[in-house]
Amino acid sequence: MKGRFGRFGGQYVPETVMNALIELEREFEEAKKDEKFMEEYRYYLKEYSGRPTPLYYAENLTKRLGGAKIYLKREDLNHTGAHKINNVLGQVLLAKRMGKKRIIAETGAGQHGVATATAAAMFGMECEIFMGEEDIKRQALNVFRMKLLGAKVTAVTSGTRTLKDAVNEAIRDWVTNIETTFYVIGSVVGPHPYPTMVRDFQRVIGDETKEQILEKEGRLPDYVVACVGGGSNAMGIFYPFIEDKGVKLVGVEAAGEGIETGKHASAMAKGSVGVLHGMMTYLLQDEEGKILPVHSISAGLDYPGVGPEHAYLKEIGRAEYVYATDEEALAAFMDLSRTEGIIPALESAHALAYAMKLAKKLDEDKIIVVNLSGRGDKDVNTVAKVMGVEL
């Protein structure tokens, strides 16, 4: 069935949204086959975002841990500081192709909002970003950044006032303004065609990584490790390696204060199958199917679900999903900053925390690639607060 990954995915949406999804899928399929569109997309990735991003051998870190070689895929070096721009450029170009005048998006950490506002500014489109009131408090800098870029930021005060509520609000707006408006989803979530479309715009990460590691090591890595919230950075780096059975794919979720505390965001470890935001996937929900509150030190990972293709990769055993706590992520954040002079996003620090544990157990001839999905500038306030430092 179309838009399904095994039993996951699908289009669990009201009739009103269905027509928009059908139109979107048609346009996306056509655009993908259109060499001119793809050429324009690649042009902006290179000239505007600065791709390809380096695959960096973290020599200091590797030597200190004394195990497997650690390479970092430097998505933090993209324009706007994370992998988000890869997908946003693709979707905004698609919106332009479809003749839409207005761009809307949801955002949690604010990174996807900033990337969307950035692309909208460049293409001269009106932009509105929906953001949970709680997240607005946590991410004041990103909120101001979006406003600087000309976007309107709308606070969402319903529900838990976080990412999931922002998504609901954005969908509501989209349905009302379908003629003029394009909804840019920031992760491999939502109803079909979004999970596929976002993956296709993010796979550039894995395509580059494959080429780069072959050039540097003459072989593929033993492990590819990435953090998973919705899971677009992970899907982007995993996808080109799926057929390479010798490469182990590891997604790292946020265990928050601990997987047994109820204050975490590990849908794979603790969730059950259900429907949210138009897709069937693993969700953190109670017996009645009510979505549970989630927690992570990193705003970008506190999503109560996970992309349906990840759910499928877990089910067929092609990828493994583990988790790292707030504390472990913080330690990795500090570690990379001091060892390599790279301040990672707290999201990426979850992947790094697991990779560091893993590296110690492996022989020196093994290779681990970690997707460093974003830079940590946005998290400096959070980390300072945890350390009791007044800024």
Curated annotation (Swiss-Prot):
Its cofactor is pyridoxal 5'-phosphate. One of its GO terms (molecular function) is tryptophan synthase activity. GO terms for cellular component: cytoplasm. Pfam families: PALP. InterPro entries: Trp_synth_b_CS (IPR006653), Trp_synth_beta (IPR006654), Trp_synth_beta/beta-like (IPR023026), TrpB-like_PALP (IPR001926), TrpB-like_PALP_sf (IPR036052). HAMAP family: Trp_synth_beta. The beta subunit is responsible for the synthesis of L-tryptophan from indole and L-serine. Tetramer of two alpha and two beta chains. This is Tryptophan synthase beta chain. It comes from Caldanaerobacter subterraneus subsp. tengcongensis (strain DSM 15242 / JCM 11007 / NBRC 100824 / MB4) (Thermoanaerobacter tengcongensis). The lineage of its organism: Bacteria, Bacillati, Bacillota, Clostridia, Thermoanaerobacterales.
